[in-house]
Amino acid sequence: MDSENCSITENSSSHLERGQKDHGTSIHFEKHHEGSIQVSIPWAVLIVVLITSLIIALIALNVGKYNCPGLYEKLESSDHHVATCKNEWISYKRTCYFFSTTTKSWALAQRSCSEDAATLAVIDSEKDMTFLKRYSGELEHWIGLKNEANQTWKWANGKEFNSWFNLTGSGRCVSVNHKNVTAVDCEANFHWVCSKPSR
């Protein structure tokens, strides 16, 4: 019996010398190698699953771009347009607008706009009109609508006015403020609004 006890003691001591710690009935191995990282198995599995999921998601997104190129091109071209307007110009719906701080006659205001490769504002929709009224405030601003010698009303870009908004007054040039769109004398001195497409 003594020889059995001796062999167990020798085995136990030789295992303890190699890094084992005896904690009662369970034995826990702790091997420390220089430069190694110890990660428990559940954490290792979680990391592998996350990396795999990320790779699958990236592959799925790239495959979607090739299977539905029209959808991605449409989103990229329409949603990511950044208007480039000069300083002091305001960007709205792919158009640059300039609201003057001085006053001039309609003809001189149109000339000032031309110097910036623009015209007095041409308004195509109710939304554009709401935008101009809001920014004009209480001050009268020239826009690019004029009646040449009692003929048809035309915009500064040459298009005919189709009477889509109510125009009051008896003048031949049109101004706008936050409430009204009015035909007034072209020689009056008002602020003005220039417009041109954004780049």
Swiss-Prot record:
Constitutive Ser/Thr phosphorylation in both mature thymocytes and activated T-lymphocytes. It is found in: Cell membrane. Disulfide bonds join C85-C96, C113-C194, C173-C186. It holds the Pfam family Lectin_C. GO terms for cellular component: cell surface; external side of plasma membrane; protein-containing complex. GO terms for biological process: cellular response to xenobiotic stimulus; negative regulation of T cell migration; negative regulation of T-helper 17 cell lineage commitment. Glycans are attached at N150, N166, N180. The chain crosses the membrane at residues 41-61. Induction: By the activation of T-lymphocytes. Homodimer; disulfide-linked. Interacts with S100A8 and S100A9. Interacts with galactin-1/LGALS1. Interacts with S1PR1; this interaction mediates S1PR1 degradation. Interacts with JAK3 and STAT5. This is Early activation antigen CD69. The gene is Cd69.
